[in-house]
Amino acid sequence: MAVQTLHIHLVSDSTGETVHQVARACLAQFADVKIIEHVWTLVRTPAHLEALFEGLDRNPGILLMSIIDQNLRSSIEKTCRSKGVPAVSVLDPVVNMLTTVLGQAMTNLPGGQRRLDTAYFARMAAVDFAVSHDDGMNMSNLKKADMLIVGISRTSKTPTSMYLAHRGYKVANYALVPKVPFPQHYLDGLDLFVVGLTNDPKRLSQIRRTRQAAMQDNANEDYADIDQITDEVRNARRLFASNGWPVIDVTRRSVEETAAAILQYYTKWAETRS
């Protein structure tokens, strides 16, 4: 099948992250398509539309927008119709449903989700927490954590912690090291959600060898040894089972998928305590 080329114009009155993520999720369902993105952010006045319309003339394709101002949206929709450019407002279905269910009109505030409000500062605090509680640091401060991620080396603990932090969760993580007992005493007296991450030993060996090559580390031969890793995985699973912690196999999972699985377990855990 021949590869198709599609110009896609992503238009937003804020950072463009919302419309970009929607486009990314949808386009992932189509193969053999070469996507050329044209990003138009902070579009908030009629003057900003001139460059956009010129861009549509140069590279016609489709347009996805996240624009709150009704006048700007109307102008974009009218121009797109005249140019034969399909246009979709990605927020409309959800906003319309919420308007009906809640019985109130939207605020028409561009970039409303990025206001410097309490939730924003809570997310930033969560990021700071994840950084200062990475790889076993400050384990004595776990009483302030929402959750603890435990796993052997190279099971995506840090990136998963940071991803969840950007969702507002205070996450600590601990790396299991061969022949070093897990410091169980830090959990004494705490009602804390803990999840274990594991990986396929062969996959882990590949990842660790790649890391060693990148770091030019030839001293630790056991680090990527398949037998050593198999023992690490087995011992980690024993620890997880003995504590009754849920276990997630991150083999071939993206960080986003791992985080989603963690949140499923966390939600069920939290519901039993509400």
Indicate where each model-derived feature is located.
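Short beta-strand-centered segment that lines the nucleotide-binding/catalytic pocket of NTP-utilizing
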Residues: V171-F182
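Ser/Thr/Gly-rich flexible loops in soluble cytosolic domains mediating phosphotransfer, phosphorylation
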Residues: R81-A122, I226-D231, R238
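Metallocofactor- and cofactor-centric catalytic cores in central/energy metabolism, strongly enriched
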Residues: V39-I67
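Structural motif
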Residues: V11-S14, M65-Q70, R252
